């Protein structure tokens, strides 16, 4: 509400709709799908009756719809018999139950879009987590060119669909068959992009400033392969 109030008289970039989407996993997943991308199978859990709705995926991860990050507000659920207890443990807060995805890699693409509609993507990077915290990023991601192109196209489509002016990191899963699923959005500079300060033509922070200030976007070519821990 505060961002929308400010936006009535002053440009806010990214626009308040991006904050609105990113604050709630239900809205985020609906937004991603509306943009033409796929997500892991999921169902919203908001009331007790939702615990027995058709189409629930097990095993799965029950995540609070809001205020969850770095593994907080998440519980693994092996079967339908465990779901009610897990929901109780999360305080019966609105949640999403995501089906577990057998992915081959976790990647992310950071995309910038200017007020003029120009778009620049940083190359896809591979991310490794330890205890839900990013531990290592490899740039560029060691994936097939066709998969990289697919990931970049998804990120660009999401940026255009949401009329982004700014920067958004699109976290994705790569499946064994080359399919790419979108996991989360972060409309800001992202920890998986810090490598760009040392190994990219334009780093993510400069690109963010350029995009929100109406300056031409910088090039995103990798100057040398990078590994960040």
Residue map of PLM features:
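Fold-independent oxyanion-binding glycine-rich loops
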Residues: 1, 15-16, 25, 35, ...
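Conserved N-proximal alpha/beta basic substrate-recognition cap immediately N-terminal to
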Residues: 1-50, 56, 67-68
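A short linear hydrophobic-aromatic micro-motif
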Residues: 41, 59-62, 94-98, 169, ...
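Acidic/histidine-enriched active-site and ligand-binding environments that engage anionic O-linkages
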Residues: 54-61, 105
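Internal nucleotide-binding/catalytic subdomain
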Residues: 73, 77-170, 174-176
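Active-site "cap" helix and flanking loop/linker of ATP-utilizing ligase/carboxylase catalytic domains
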Residues: 149-170, 176, 186-229
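Conserved protein kinase catalytic/activation segment
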Residues: 178-181
């Amino acid at each position: 509400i505060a961002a929308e109030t400010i936006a009535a008289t002053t440009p806010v970039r990214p626009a308040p709709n991006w904050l609105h989407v990113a604050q709630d996993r239900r809205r985020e997943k609906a937004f991603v799908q509306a943009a033409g991308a796929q997500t892991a199978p999921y169902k919203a859990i908001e009331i007790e009756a939702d615990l027995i709705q058709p189409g629930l995926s097990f095993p799965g991860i029950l995540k609070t719809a809001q205020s969850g990050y770095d593994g907080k507000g998440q519980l693994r659920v092996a079967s339908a018999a465990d779901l009610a207890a897990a929901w109780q443990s999360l305080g019966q807060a609105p949640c999403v139950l995501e089906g577990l995805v057998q992915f081959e890699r976790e990647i992310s693409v950071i995309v910038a879009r200017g007020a003029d509609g120009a778009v620049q993507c940083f190359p896809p990077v591979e991310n490794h987590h330890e205890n839900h915290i990013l531990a290592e990023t490899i740039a560029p991601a060691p994936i097939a060119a066709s998969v990289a192109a697919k990931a970049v196209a998804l990120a660009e489509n999401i940026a255009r669909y949401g009329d982004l002016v700014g920067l958004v990191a699109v976290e994705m899963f790569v499946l064994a068959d080359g399919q790419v699923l979108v996991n989360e959005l972060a409309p800001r500079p992202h920890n998986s992009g810090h490598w760009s300060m040392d190994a990219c033509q334009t780093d993510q922070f400069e690109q963010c400033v350029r995009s929100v200030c109406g300056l031409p976007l910088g090039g995103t070519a990798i100057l040398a392969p990078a590994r960040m821990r």
